UniProtKB/Swiss-Prot annotation:
Recorded metabolic or biological pathway in which this protein acts: Amino-acid biosynthesis; L-histidine biosynthesis; L-histidine from 5-phospho-alpha-D-ribose 1-diphosphate: step 1/9
Protein name in the entry: ATP phosphoribosyltransferase regulatory subunit
Location(s), subcellular: Cytoplasm
Name of the coding gene: hisZ
GO molecular function: histidine-tRNA ligase activity
GO cellular component, one term: cytoplasm
Entry-linked Gene3D superfamilies: Bira Bifunctional Protein, Domain 2
Length: 383
């Protein structure tokens, strides 16, 4: 193996793209800030039992584990920042009994990629709200998610909605055990209605519940899905409440193209209610995903309502505006010492100044000029 080779699905970010990413990150955090979201920076590595909440089984498969040479305990390299933010809200910010609005933008590392086209080191950015159970909180986060997409040239963005509360209400009413619910959840993702029908028939469920589960994979499409669902699903208060929340989101974004899928349930995840995602043209998967995950902080001692979204900022590469390198002022190597004060003054003003050693350099080909002493004063002389 060549010493310069990197592991599969791991890549360097070179200067052109690095400038784009850093600019996008700054814009994103500024957007979050003016909406009241405070930046947190959790550590890249924690004790494994803190990272693996046992709520999201899939997270354990993504998390790289190592042994801490200091304590002998098992450490994990984070694969998702949300459990860390839940820990911060539950423990470090527990003095605030009201709403905590938090945001982040940092790298995570996956033991295996989510797909052939996905990287194992995403730059995960997101925003989360803790302490507010009302649907207005979800609407605020969805609005912020859609605004985040405008940092890049995404074109028309599709908002996709689901609600795991409908499936769970039906599961409880039909008295499914945990194993049956997990099996049915997995089948729902494939939208294989025949297999779903065969499974509920094998379990000999009551006809009303068997019909409802068989119907869920067919309830997808535009806003009209909600009225269809109201007329065909069992009249359960939890189902009606979930449909009401979906309707509230649709009403909040009248000009947005919306797709509703009542069998979009995200197997092996920590979400508990409304699910939302943003899709854009030419992306093989959702650009951003979010949803409600009430109670996640309970693993850390304080269960609270929570909703939020995240995305891989590196996936924006190719859609971000070009950030040209700042033209540099050159100073001859033999003049560097004498011109030191003038050089530092220019740098404090934000001007890039590079010492020219006469052997070529990787500065912008478009130079701002050269620092020369004219009439006893160091001045930038244009070429």
């Amino acid at each position: 193996m060549q010493t310069w080779q990197l592991p599969e699905h791991i890549a360097d970010v070179l200067p052109t793209n690095a400038r784009q990413l850093e600019s996008a990150r700054e814009q994103l955090l500024a957007l979050f800030r003016v909406h009241g979201y405070e930046l947190v920076q959790p550590p890249l590595m924690e004790y494994a039992h803190s990272l693996l909440t046992h709520i999201d089984a899939g997270l354990s498969l993504k998390t790289i584990l190592v042994t801490d040479r200091l304590s002998g305990r098992q450490l994990g390299i984070r694969a998702d920042i949300t459990p860390q933010v839940a820990r911060i809200d539950a423990h470090l910010l527990s003095a605030n009994q009201g709403i905590n609005r938090l945001c982040y933008a940092g790298p995570v590392l996956h033991a295996q990629s989510d797909g052939l086209l996905n990287m194992r080191e995403p730059l995960q950015a997101g925003a989360e709200m803790y302490g507010f159970a009302d649907i207005r909180g979800d609407i605020e986060l969805i609005d912020l998610m859609l605004k985040s997409m405008k940092i890049a040239d995404m074109g028309k963005v599709l908002l996709s909605l689901g609600h795991i509360g409908i499936f769970r209400a039906l599961s409880d009413a039909a008295h499914l055990d945990a194993g049956q619910s997990a099996t049915l959840l997995a089948l729902m993702q494939d939208k294989d209605t025949e297999t779903v029908e065969a499974q509920v028939k094998a379990w000999k469920l009551d006809g009303m519940w068997a019909k409802a589960f068989s119907l869920l994979p067919r309830l997808y499409g535009g806003r009209e899905v909600l009225s269809d669902a109201r007329g065909r699903l069992p009249d359960l208060s939890a189902v009606g409440g979930a449909l009401g929340e979906l309707q509230a989101v649709c009403d909040a974004f009248p000009d947005c193209e919306i797709h509703i899928d009542l069998s979009e349930l995200r197997v092996d995840n920590y979400h508990t209610g409304l699910l939302y995602a943003a899709y854009a043209a030419d992306f093989h998967d959702a650009v951003a995903r979010g949803g409600r995950y009430d109670g996640l902080g309970g693993y850390f001692g304080r269960a609270r309502p929570a909703t939020g979204f995240s995305f891989d900022l590196r996936s924006f590469i190719g859609r971000l505006p070009a950030i040209e390198r700042q033209p540099a002022v050159l100073v001859d190597a033999e003049d560097a010492e004498a011109a030191h004060e003038a050089v530092e003054a220019l740098r404090e003003q934000g001007q890039c100044v590079v010492i020219d050693y006469g052997i070529g350099h990787n500065v912008s080909e478009e130079l701002a000029g050269r620092l020369k002493k004219t009439d006893g004063v160091w001045q930038v002389v244009k070429r």
